[in-house]
């Protein structure tokens, strides 16, 4: 039986008010709050202001990552939420971002990432070797 | 006529030698070199070591981002390369990572991100307002 290691939601947001996505501090605030909305665990966050327009940012999570890249001159933002563990957390984080930016149109896709055969289990020999067992 | 703002390659790598993806310093080296292979422009890079196994990391690019999350106990790594501009750079960066990790199987998908109607052009009024023109 297969199981998946992660859930990845990608969303392209169109018709966004450009003033909401132009500044690094605004997308930082947006993504930090999405982490709270999803009850996710932040490791670190990193943002960058482009000149003259747009910003980019990522939050590394214990559960994987959230990223955003913005083109305010096109009223467009691309957002990724990739989490392992409880899938509802990814949906809650993405919903927070979409609701906050109120795009006129969203192109959203959802993928399972890392599909493994549960029957094969873990690489026990390697794990034991790392633990100094063999 | 439509044009796309970015190209996103996602790849799940299976059957990877776990010793190649267990340590933060190894995936840092891998991703930093993929940036060079793709002739991409690094803004900043961020990595984290999980305990007991696996690591996570992202490089913010002027062109968007590269990320990796690893599960050495499952011989699995998930990799994203998302770039705007010349699409060949994304392929070269991803090819570098895949060739370096030599997985037995790869599940790879490619997406256009941010598809805009070129005929609509940019939001000129907003751009002018930001430039203090109106």
UniProtKB/Swiss-Prot annotation, chains A, B:
The keyword Coiled coil does not apply. The record marks 63-64 as: Cleavage (non-hydrolytic). Keywords: Autocatalytic cleavage, Decarboxylase, Lyase, Polyamine biosynthesis, Pyruvate, S-adenosyl-L-methionine, Schiff base, Spermidine biosynthesis, Zymogen. Gene3D superfamilies: S-adenosylmethionine decarboxylase (3.60.90.10). Belongs to the prokaryotic AdoMetDC family. Type 1 subfamily. Heterotetramer of two alpha and two beta chains arranged as a dimer of alpha/beta heterodimers. This is S-adenosylmethionine decarboxylase proenzyme. GO terms for biological process: spermidine biosynthetic process. SUPFAM superfamilies: S-adenosylmethionine decarboxylase (SSF56276).
């Amino acid at each position: 039986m297969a199981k998946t290691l992660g859930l990845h939601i990608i969303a392209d947001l169109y018709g966004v008010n450009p003033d909401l996505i132009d500044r690094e501090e605004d997308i930082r605030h947006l993504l930090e709050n999405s982490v709270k909305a999803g009850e996710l665990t932040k490791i670190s966050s990193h943002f960058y202001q482009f000149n003259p327009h747009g910003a980019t940012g990522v939050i590394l999570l214990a559960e994987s990552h959230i990223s955003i890249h913005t083109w305010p001159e096109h009223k467009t933002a691309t957002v990724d939420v990739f989490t392992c563990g409880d899938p509802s957390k990814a949906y809650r984080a993405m919903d927070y971002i979409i609701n906050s930016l109120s795009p006129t149109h969203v192109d959203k896709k959802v993928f399972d990432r890392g599909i493994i055969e549960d029957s094969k289990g873990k690489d026990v020999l390697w794990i034991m070797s790392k633990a100094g067992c063999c």
